[in-house]
């Protein structure tokens, strides 16, 4: 099963995240299938860059976003609250 989830990048105490598509059982920082965006919670306001076409493509292929990624997608207006 594919998941759309976050993987951590950045320096210690300064997190930044990639939004990736990967197998559900793979480790957090393992290789990934596709990079669909980035998320930086340290900026004010938070910076979220998401490729909507890629996200919708992978959701169409059966990828499930994690709760955090689903919140980011909803906030960006890419998916509905369903």
UniProtKB/Swiss-Prot annotation:
PROSITE patterns recorded: RIBOSOMAL_S16 (PS00732)
GO MF terms held by the record: structural constituent of ribosome
Keyword tags: Ribonucleoprotein, Ribosomal protein
Pfam families assigned: Ribosomal_S16
One Gene Ontology cellular component: small ribosomal subunit
Gene Ontology annotations of biological process type: translation
The keyword Ribonucleoprotein appears for this protein: yes
Residue spans crossing the bilayer: none
Keyword Metal-binding on entry: no
InterPro entries per UniProt: Ribosomal_bS16, Ribosomal_bS16_CS, Ribosomal_bS16_dom_sf
Signal sequence extent: none
Family (UniProt): Belongs to the bacterial ribosomal protein bS16 family.
Name of this chain's protein: Small ribosomal subunit protein bS16
Organism annotation: Dehalococcoides mccartyi (strain ATCC BAA-2100 / JCM 16839 / KCTC 5957 / BAV1)
